[in-house]
Amino acid sequence: MNDLAGLQALVEDVGSGNVIDAELLDGCPVEAHELDEMDASQAAQVAAHCFGLLFDHKVEQLQGLEEDLDAGLWTGTVDGFGFQIRRDDVGDLVLDFSSQQA
């Protein structure tokens, strides 16, 4: 999908609350057992992989900005879209994208 407006609309519509599960991680360079200890760069790789699957878009620029292992929180950007990976109340990692940079 090359239409930026269409991509932004998709991100706003279905970009929040994506649980990172085995199916979503399939083919990702970061494996499931590495998620709890990943650094910001690895979080960006996970976000870019998931972004590509969810939105049928090849990510060209990714950047991990912050990680807080104690809080279970990682942030960064993929192709100008902000991302946040957070641990929810039941222990799942949830990926949220936003149309504005994190």
Where are the regions a protein language model picked out?
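Intrinsic disorder/low-complexity segments
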Residues: 16, 25, 51, 64, ...
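Short terminal alpha-helical segments
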Residues: 3-28
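Acidic, low-complexity, intrinsically disordered interaction modules
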Residues: 30-92
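Short intrinsically disordered terminal tails
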Residues: 1-5, 94, 98-102
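Compositionally biased regions
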Residues: 6, 17, 29, 33, ...
